[in-house]
Amino acid sequence: MEPLTAYPLRCSGPKAKAFAVLLSMVLCTVMLFLLQLKFLKPKINSFYTFEVKDANGRVVSLEKFKGKVALVVNVASDCQLTDRNYLALQELHKEFGPFHFSVLAFPCNQFGESEPRPSKEVVSFARNNFGVTFPIFHKIKILGSEAEPAFRFLVDSSKKEPRWNFWKYLVNPEGQVVKTWRPEEPIEVIRPEIAALIRQMIIKKKEDL
């Protein structure tokens, strides 16, 4: 019996070569398409381009806050920092609100499970106990694969991920993060930064007239 290698294997031919060429062309086309998606896809560079849910679960656009200065905060009702921070946030909102500024609060239960309430109850709690008048949105997740995209944008932009409740992100009128604060930092540190950003915004608007 002759060895198998004595008989050459016929593994190629005109049809096989044509198929290989066609397959290569298809793969190249797919790769080019994927590269186009990667490089041509518009990069989101503004917090105000996102949609979120309000406390009632309705989808709302953050576009309405474009052109304003915003202080975005992850809040919780049953935290040792709750009283001090809610009072300080309301004070800032009341002081600077007339000058195109708003506090935007996002309840989260990922830090010590300190926000067990449904979103509507969070709003009632904050209003009844601290006189809060700024927007409080639907309860979200901040960490992990289910993180709210709008908040993820703040984290990725600033390279500052919350480690507890009441982290604060100062967002300019164009939707970019310009400053962050940890929960224990006092309002006296935050106030001048907000005032300076509002001042810049007002000057720019006057120059554009």
UniProtKB/Swiss-Prot annotation:
Q: Where is the chain membrane-spanning?
A: 18-40
Q: Which SUPFAM superfamilies match?
A: Thioredoxin-like
* Cited PANTHER family: GLUTATHIONE PEROXIDASE, GLUTATHIONE PEROXIDASE 8-RELATED
Q: Which residues carry this modification: N-acetylmethionine?
A: 1
Q: Entry's PROSITE patterns? A: GLUTATHIONE_PEROXID_2 (PS00763), GLUTATHIONE_PEROXID_3 (PS51355)
> What family is this?
Belongs to the glutathione peroxidase family.
Concerning Gene3D superfamilies, the annotation shows: Glutaredoxin
**Catalytic activity from the UniProt record:** 2 glutathione + H2O2 = glutathione disulfide + 2 H2O
Q: Name one GO molecular function term.
A: glutathione peroxidase activity
Put simply, this protein is called Probable glutathione peroxidase 8
Q: What is its EC number?
A: 1.11.1.9
GO CC, sorted alphabetically, is: membrane
A Pfam short name:
GSHPx
Location of this chain's protein in the cell: Membrane
Bilayer topology term: Single-pass membrane protein
The superkingdom of the source organism is Eukaryota
- Coiled-coil stretches: none
